[in-house]
Amino acid sequence: MDLVALLKSHFLCHLIFCYVFIVSGLIINTIQLCTLLLWPVNKQLFRKINCRLSYCVSSQLVMLLEWWSGTECVIYTDPRAYPKYGKENAIVVLNHKFEIDFLCGWSLAERFGVLGGSKVLAKKELAYVPIIGWMWYFTEMVFCTRKWEQDRKTVSESLLHLRDYPEKYFFLIHCEGTRFTEKKHQISMQVAQAKGLPSLKHHLLPRTKGFAVTVRSLRNVVSAVYDCTLNFRNNENPTLLGVLNGKKYHADLYVRRIPLEEVPEEEDKCAAWLHKLYQEKDAFQEEYSRTGTFPETPVVPPRRPWTLVNWLFWASMLLYPFFRFVINMVSSGSSLTLASFVLVFFVASMGVRWMIGVTEIDKGSAYGNMDSKQKHSD
């Protein structure tokens, strides 16, 4: 292991990242809370401010992926569609197989300048996760319980609120509903067989109702669906902890731009369209597993410096008083003070580890693991 790799995996570096992320995140959450006063007076100003505050948080994680770990992402896409990316609102349909697929989605949004305003259809429990979840609440993310009887009205209402959103955004949706595992895949294919649908090898059966209501609610506001199929070279199994340790991954992302006019309006036809889309995604993944490449022209969108600039800003603001505080505590020589200091940072480290654990496959939700007879209907 070289010196740089050793440094990146050192606990002190992780402590610095965690400290900057937690403290800056809580400061930003506090500012976001104060901006609620603007909502009844000027809703659009509230949204623009929170869009930029959101960027200050989410871009720190993108910085870890792009600058700290140096992960490379090659996009395969139609050169005629490429100039439109970032200049229009889009629904991004991404496969859900890797622990950092959400981070790759954020990186895609960042490369095209729409990270701050981008949205996601997320499970409601994430709204209670400090910093990220609270940030999402203030930026009008769409939360769901994944029980359609409860979500039918609330999800539609949340989506309709985005029709006059003042910033460009990608609306990221994992139509599979949960991250891919072999157990979930086996159960999902039992459902596919029962419904007379073709089996998928690399994906779970997509949940069509959430996608249909998203398309219906955002039609004439969103210009296209971006069908995104993600994979990693050499059978890499990326993790958020690996990114924090500075491990470099090599991502390939196939992006197809599909005008929203081509997506049927009727729910049944929209469901059939989505099933066909996932059969095509499965074929692309199968081709990638055989050849190591996707169709279309490969392109690497340039990294923007703003994620790094943002992190350096917060680090310069927060690290000086932090180290002054540490030096003063050590100089005091008080055992009780030092013990309290160690305890606080142990708890903070465990909190960050818990947030990382939310992304881990082996600790993912049980959604999709129930018996096929007990699964909610599409």
UniProtKB/Swiss-Prot annotation:
It comes from the Eukaryota. SMART domains: PlsC (SM00563). The chain crosses the membrane at residues 11-31, 125-145, 307-327, 338-358. GO terms for cellular component: endomembrane system; endoplasmic reticulum; endoplasmic reticulum membrane; mitochondrial outer membrane. It is a multi-pass membrane protein. GO terms for molecular function: 1-acylglycerol-3-phosphate O-acyltransferase activity. GO terms for biological process: CDP-diacylglycerol biosynthetic process. Pathway: Phospholipid metabolism; CDP-diacylglycerol biosynthesis; CDP-diacylglycerol from sn-glycerol 3-phosphate: step 2/3. Its EC number is 2.3.1.51. A motif (HXXXXD motif) lies at residues 96-101. Its main location: endoplasmic reticulum. Keywords: Acyltransferase, Endoplasmic reticulum, Lipid biosynthesis, Lipid metabolism, Membrane, Phospholipid biosynthesis, Phospholipid metabolism, Transferase, Transmembrane, Transmembrane helix. InterPro entries: Acyltransf_C (IPR032098), Plipid/glycerol_acylTrfase (IPR002123). It catalyses: a 1-acyl-sn-glycero-3-phosphate + an acyl-CoA = a 1,2-diacyl-sn-glycero-3-phosphate + CoA; (4Z,7Z,10Z,13Z,16Z,19Z)-docosahexaenoyl-CoA + 1-hexadecanoyl-sn-glycero-3-phosphate = 1-hexadecanoyl-2-(4Z,7Z,10Z,13Z,16Z,19Z-docosahexaenoyl)-sn-glycero-3-phosphate + CoA; 1-octadecanoyl-sn-glycero-3-phosphate + (9Z,12Z)-octadecadienoyl-CoA = 1-octadecanoyl-2-(9Z,12Z-octadecadienoyl)-sn-glycero-3-phosphate + CoA; 1-octadecanoyl-sn-glycero-3-phosphate + (4Z,7Z,10Z,13Z,16Z,19Z)-docosahexaenoyl-CoA = 1-octadecanoyl-2-(4Z,7Z,10Z,13Z,16Z,19Z-docosahexaenoyl)-sn-glycero-3-phosphate + CoA. Pfam families: Acyltransf_C, Acyltransferase. It is found in: Endoplasmic reticulum membrane. The HXXXXD motif is essential for acyltransferase activity and may constitute the binding site for the phosphate moiety of the glycerol-3-phosphate. Belongs to the 1-acyl-sn-glycerol-3-phosphate acyltransferase family. Converts 1-acyl-sn-glycerol-3-phosphate (lysophosphatidic acid or LPA) into 1,2-diacyl-sn-glycerol-3-phosphate (phosphatidic acid or PA) by incorporating an acyl moiety at the sn-2 position of the glycerol backbone. Exhibits high acyl-CoA specificity for polyunsaturated fatty acyl-CoA, especially docosahexaenoyl-CoA (22:6-CoA, DHA-CoA). This is 1-acyl-sn-glycerol-3-phosphate acyltransferase delta. It comes from Bos taurus.
